[in-house]
């Protein structure tokens, strides 16, 4: 099957935003105008096309990023819908990895919310070119220019308006286009009919001022435009668009547009901007990877004539076809029914069917080409972040890093007969979501699930019931504490010697143990010289230490951020074995960690509460009562924003408490910030449990 759209006319974009900025509605409208959906779904009715999992429709939030295809002006646009809720940032990170450009959506009233900052930082990390759309211009308190200021202050973005609104709130009627210097006014409710007219008199002066700002911003990035601008020459629309496109692709400028997706205004102009300014797969640097055979770096250019390479970025359990693997093709062509090589795992798999997903129906494809996003049926052993490629030209593309879960709960089926069903279902869900982990507690035999927050785990339990028909009970959430040491201890001995009749055991090690900075993990340094311990036993010593670290020395939590130097020891010709050295390593670690002033660390969350003035005192008092550390306050519209660091252990049930304290008028977001030592009195409680 030949390529349907040239690479130059393909756009892979994501829509990133804070919860409630109107992302799903905007995507809906895009699908409507590009002719793929005939009746628009409203999130308020739970009918939006993108939100295809049932719980999303109930909660009105988007959880999984479905990849959807549509066309506009002879271009193919693949949209990845990304969730905006803090517990799902991993989904966002995962989708940013496979996009070429993004639309950052802001609410005209709320502006830059905490989650927008997180997502923006993630997009900076992957150098994603973006344009911004200030949505909800029809809402009370909408202020386009304030949002621009917030983008500059809070995100450090070089935000340049390409449009200004005509009116706002109920009087929002249209848009002034600063690139073409005319106005767009809408003729009907569906916003399909609009016309370009002269800029209304009372907006002329403001339009000219912002046009000047636009030209100034562009001339700083483009010398030719700078010359023309300084000499007062006319700059054509095409020249302006070309320079703007370059600025966006270099991630030096963020053009800002405005509109109201709900009222169907501004969406077509947003689609035009996607085509004018966001990159095609050819405009982004070729993807880099490592050849697993030679361990050398290689690149894959976006082109059908290159060897096939793709990245699996999402796994979903689909009720009709089983496991769906969403993947992005970076180079080459893939035929349905052919074999691919999973270079991350080192084995071959056969692709069954290839589906191009539209939000609620799917189209079968015989083949997919460089730059395409599609879903494959039949890949049994491929996980998120795996590379799929041509076996004769293997490459491993950089995988994604996922944060460790911060919260865990025990889970059990309501009837014991469903235990196997539960285990299978949890395994399927863990395959889909790398930040969701399942393990069995060896001491109690309980199944423990871990995730990124209460909502994350609630959604999982919800899905168990709906998709897998397993009714489960969950225990009280537990915090993922860690342990570490605070001082260096040298010459710690670990001896494991049993020499009484028969084959003996002999392992003897001497180590230094010292703390590392937060987040540095575990470092093992081998300084054995002169064969004091034979080479083949060294890995066993490390294994013994790593295993002992899993259960810490204070309260059974994993020990982190420490360095062990193996410096001496002794062995016995006959009695030494890997097992003996493994046990010696573990004895030395426990001994050393006990002496190195161990402490318990707890996860501290970055909490932001948006609260009406009159409840401010109660909210701050409550945060202090939760061992919170208030970092600052600022006004936002008619509310106050309180920022604080609060231990996760104190945040359980906060949503309910906050609702009752403020009659439901305050909202909060929290995300993991860092670990810090627990106060002594609380450490005693934790150890005593």
From Swiss-Prot:
Coiled coil: none annotated. GO terms for molecular function: GTP binding; GTPase activity; translation elongation factor activity. GO terms for cellular component: cytoplasm. Keywords: Cytoplasm, Elongation factor, GTP-binding, Nucleotide-binding, Protein biosynthesis. InterPro entries: EFG_II, EFG_III, EFG_III/V, EFG_IV, EFG_V, EFG_V-like, EFTu-like_2, G_TR_CS. Residues 8-282 form the tr-type G domain. The keyword Transmembrane helix does not apply. GTP binds at residues 17-24, 81-85, 135-138. GO terms for biological process: ribosome disassembly. Its main location: cytoplasm. Belongs to the TRAFAC class translation factor GTPase superfamily. Classic translation factor GTPase family. EF-G/EF-2 subfamily. Catalyzes the GTP-dependent ribosomal translocation step during translation elongation. During this step, the ribosome changes from the pre-translocational (PRE) to the post-translocational (POST) state as the newly formed A-site-bound peptidyl-tRNA and P-site-bound deacylated tRNA move to the P and E sites, respectively. Catalyzes the coordinated movement of the two tRNA molecules, the mRNA and conformational changes in the ribosome. This is Elongation factor G.
């Amino acid at each position: 099957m030949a390529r349907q759209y040239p690479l130059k006319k393909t756009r892979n974009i994501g829509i990133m935003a804070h919860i409630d900025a109107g992302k799903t509605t905007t995507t809906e409208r895009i699908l409507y105008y590009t002719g793929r959906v005939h009746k628009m779904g409203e999130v308020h009715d739970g009918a939006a096309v993108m939100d295809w999992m049932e719980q999303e429709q109930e909660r009105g939030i988007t959880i999984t990023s479905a990849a959807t295809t549509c066309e506009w002006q002879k271009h193919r646009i693949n949209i990845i819908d990304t969730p905006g809720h803090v517990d799902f940032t991993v989904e966002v990170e995962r989708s940013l990895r496979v996009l070429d450009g993004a639309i950052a959506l802001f609410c005209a009233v709320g502006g830059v919310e905490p989650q927008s900052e997180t997502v923006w930082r993630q997009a900076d990390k992957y150098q994603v070119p973006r344009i911004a759309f200030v949505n909800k211009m029809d809402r009370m308190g909408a202020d386009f220019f304030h949002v621009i200021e917030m983008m500059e202050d809070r995100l450090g973005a070089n935000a340049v308006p390409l449009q200004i609104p005509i009116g706002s709130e109920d009087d929002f009627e249209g848009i002034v286009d600063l690139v073409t210097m005319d106005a767009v006014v809408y003729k009907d409710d569906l916003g399909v009919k609009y016309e370009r007219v002269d800029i209304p008199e009372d907006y002329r002066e403001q339009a000219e001022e912002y046009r000047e700002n636009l030209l100034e911003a562009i001339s700083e990035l483009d010398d030719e435009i700078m010359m023309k601008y300084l000499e007062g020459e006319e700059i054509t629309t095409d020249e302006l668009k070309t320079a703007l496109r370059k600025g966006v692709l270099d991630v030096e400028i963020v053009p800002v547009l405005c509109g109201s997706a709900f009222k169907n205004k501004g969406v077509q102009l947003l689609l035009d901007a996607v085509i004018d300014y966001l990159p095609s797969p050819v405009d982004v640097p070729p993807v880099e990877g490592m050849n697993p055979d030679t361990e050398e770096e290689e690149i894959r250019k976006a082109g059908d004539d290159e060897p096939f390479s793709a990245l699996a970025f999402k796994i979903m359990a689909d009720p009709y076809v089983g496991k769906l693997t969403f993947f992005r093709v970076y180079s080459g062509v893939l035929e349905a029914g052919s074999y691919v090589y999973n270079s991350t795992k080192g084995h071959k798999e056969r692709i069954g069917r290839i589906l191009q997903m539209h939000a609620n129906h799917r189209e079968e494809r015989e083949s997919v080409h460089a730059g395409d996003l599609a879903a494959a049926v039949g890949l049994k052993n491929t996980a998120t972040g795996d590379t799929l490629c041509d076996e004769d030209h293997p490459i491993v593309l950089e995988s994604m890093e996922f944060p460790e879960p911060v919260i865990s709960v025990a889970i059990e089926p309501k009837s014991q007969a469903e235990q196997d069903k539960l285990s299978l279902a949890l395994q399927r869900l863990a395959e889909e979501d790398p930040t969701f982990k399942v393990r069995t507690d060896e001491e109690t035999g309980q199944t423990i699930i871990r995730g990124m927050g209460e909502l994350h785990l609630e959604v999982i339990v919800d899905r168990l019931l709906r998709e897998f028909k397993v009714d489960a009970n969950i225990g009280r959430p537990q915090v993922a504490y860690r342990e570490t040491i605070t001082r260096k201890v040298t010459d710690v001995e670990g001896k494991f010697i049993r020499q009484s009749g028969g084959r003996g055991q002999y392992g003897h090690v001497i180590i230094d143990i010292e703390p590392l900075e937060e987040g540095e993990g575990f470092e093992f340094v081998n300084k054995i010289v002169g064969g004091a311990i034979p080479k083949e036993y060294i890995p066993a010593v490390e294994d013994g230490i790593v295993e002992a670290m899993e259960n810490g020395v204070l309260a059974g939590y994993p020990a982190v951020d420490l360095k062990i130097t193996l410096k001496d020891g002794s062995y016995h010709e006959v009695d030494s074995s890997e097992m003996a050295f493994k046990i010696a390593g573990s004895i030395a670690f426990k001994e050393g960690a006990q002496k190195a002033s161990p402490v318990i660390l707890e996860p501290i969350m970055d909490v932001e509460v948006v609260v009406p003035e009159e409840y401010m005192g109660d909210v701050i008092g409550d945060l202090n009562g939760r061992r919170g550390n208030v970092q600052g306050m600022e006004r936002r519209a008619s509310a106050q924003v309180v920022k604080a660091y609060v231990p996760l252990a104190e945040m359980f049930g906060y949503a309910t408490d906050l609702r009752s304290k403020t009659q439901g008028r305050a909202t909060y977001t929290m995300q993991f910030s860092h670990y810090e030592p627990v106060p002594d009195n609380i450490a005693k409680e934790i150890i005593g449990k």
